[in-house]
Amino acid sequence: MAKMKHGSAQFRPDHLGTQPRKSDANKGKKMNTKGNENPQYIPPKG
């Protein structure tokens, strides 16, 4: 079991910054990191 855990650590490390696959699958994170794109909905003023 210990070997398996160590092997999976290479593919999925504890650091969030080194998990591009996880953030890709996480739609919530995608929506949260929409800083570069323009907002789809702009509330009317007034």
Curated annotation (Swiss-Prot):
Metal-binding keyword on record: no
One GO biological process term: asexual sporulation
Annotated spans, Disordered: 1-46
Location of the protein in the cell: Spore core
Example of a GO cellular component annotation carried by this entry: endospore-forming forespore
Keyword field: Sporulation
Keyword Cell division: no
Similarity-based family: Belongs to the SspN family.
Protein's name according to its UniProt entry: Small, acid-soluble spore protein N
Organism encoding this protein: Halalkalibacterium halodurans (strain ATCC BAA-125 / DSM 18197 / FERM 7344 / JCM 9153 / C-125) (Bacillus halodurans)
Gene: sspN
